[in-house]
A protein has these predicted regions:
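Short, structured motif recognition centered on aromatic/hydrophobic residues
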Residues: 9, 73-78, 98, 149
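Vicinal oxygen chelate
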Residues: 1-5, 14, 37, 76, ...
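Short beta-strand-to-loop junctions in surface cap/lid or active-site-entrance loops
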Residues: 79-85
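Short, solvent-exposed beta-strand edge segments and adjacent coil->beta transition regions
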Residues: 7-11, 63, 96-100, 136
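Short, flexible turn/loop "capping" segments at secondary-structure junctions
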Residues: 2-6, 91-95
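A short acidic/small-residue loop/turn micro-motif
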Residues: 42, 83, 155-158
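A cross-kingdom feature marking solvent-exposed beta-strand/loop segments within repeated
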Residues: 47-51, 86-87, 130-131
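Core segments of cupin and vicinal oxygen chelate
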Residues: 15-73, 117, 167
Length: 171
């Protein structure tokens, strides 16, 4: 058996209510690059139509999609399906599957303000992981559709590096 190796994270797909509003939010507020602006895909015999039949099953009809990219080349796909709807609880953390994704920015306070000004929501106060010891901060927010995004002030590796919780173990 071949030893496993770390794979790169390629992209995430987000279902949104209004693709034009979400496209503007993710490009203008979060600064993501446009790979493909909002485009309509219809069920037909094209390669993409057949591929979508395999993913969504028969009768999906049509949807709109946009492809974006982050600074570290992770793709963000925005999907607007007809008759889509928000979940009753957008933070179903006990439900299996993805319940949030995280964006890194050194000024999470400023970015959270921009998110709120653009129709999103700040779910909690900015919090410090190691008050008085390390400057690592985080906050949970929502995009205008209620998709949960976390903001980190520092990289995941720095925040959770070996010894990150050592001060708690020594007490």
């Amino acid at each position: 058996m071949t030893k496993p190796y770390p794979r790169a994270f390629s992209h995430i797909g987000l279902s949104v209510r209004d693709i034009d509003r979400s496209y503007k939010f993710y490009t203008e507020v979060l600064g993501f690059y446009t790979i493909m602006p909002p485009t309509e895909v219809e069920q037909d015999d094209s390669a993409i139509g057949i591929m979508c039949d395999r993913v969504f099953g028969p009768g999906w009809g049509r949807f709109k999609i946009a492809h974006l990219s982050t600074a570290d080349k992770v793709g963000i796909e925005l999907f607007e399906f007809p008759d889509n709807y928000p979940p009753e609880n957008n933070l179903e953390y006990r439900k299996l599957g993805i319940f949030h994704f995280c964006i890194q920015d050194p000024d999470i306070e400023g970015l959270a303000e921009k998110i709120v000004a653009a129709g999103g929501k700040q779910r909690m106060p900015v919090s410090e992981y190691y008050p008085g010891e390390k400057p690592y901060r985080m906050v949970y927010c929502e995009d205008p559709d209620g998709n949960i995004l976390e903001l980190y002030s520092h990289s995941y590796e720095l925040t959770y590096s070996p010894g990150a919780y050592q001060h708690q173990l020594d007490e």
